[in-house]
Amino acid sequence: MTSIHTGSNNNIVELDMSELIRPIPPVLDMNKVNSMMETMTGKTPPASCGLTSEDLEAGELPPVDVLTFKKSGKPYYFAFGGCHRLRAHDEAGRKKVRCKLVNCSPNTLRLYLGASANKFLDSD
């Protein structure tokens, strides 16, 4: 299962959870988080999630789409979605999460964050 924005993007990396900037507070369905945690232990995903065991490596969830850009050589990683997958990783005590990186421009980041983007984009 892939998102409409990153279906052809195979730029998947593992990032430390601490590297992700999550500017939007999540609204979580803990039943969904718990189901994802069970999937992470190797249990077959429920039919309602739209995934089959063939879609995933055992114990893995789909990667989280992450917008990234570099400023002064330092990469910044923004996760605007994937809140249930990220919480499942938190709850399971996993320090790393698979992410599908999507390069973005400063203007794209401003579309997502508005004036709040300035804290990341303004000069050092």
Swiss-Prot record:
Origin: domain of life: Eukaryota
Catalyses which reaction(s): S-hydroxy-S-oxy-L-cysteinyl-[peroxiredoxin] + [protein]-dithiol + ATP = S-hydroxy-L-cysteinyl-[peroxiredoxin] + [protein]-disulfide + ADP + phosphate
EC number: 1.8.98.2
GO biological process, any: cellular detoxification
Keywords: Antioxidant, ATP-binding, Cytoplasm, Disulfide bond, Nucleotide-binding, Nucleus, Oxidoreductase
Record-linked InterPro entries: ParB/Sulfiredoxin_dom, ParB/Sulfiredoxin_sf, Sulfiredoxin
Assigned GO CC terms: cytoplasm; cytosol; nucleus
PANTHER family: PTHR21348, SULFIREDOXIN-1
Cited function: Contributes to oxidative stress resistance by reducing cysteine-sulfinic acid formed under exposure to oxidants in a peroxiredoxin. May catalyze the reduction in a multi-step process by acting both as a specific phosphotransferase and a thioltransferase.
Family, similarity comment: Belongs to the sulfiredoxin family.
Protein name from the UniProt record: Sulfiredoxin
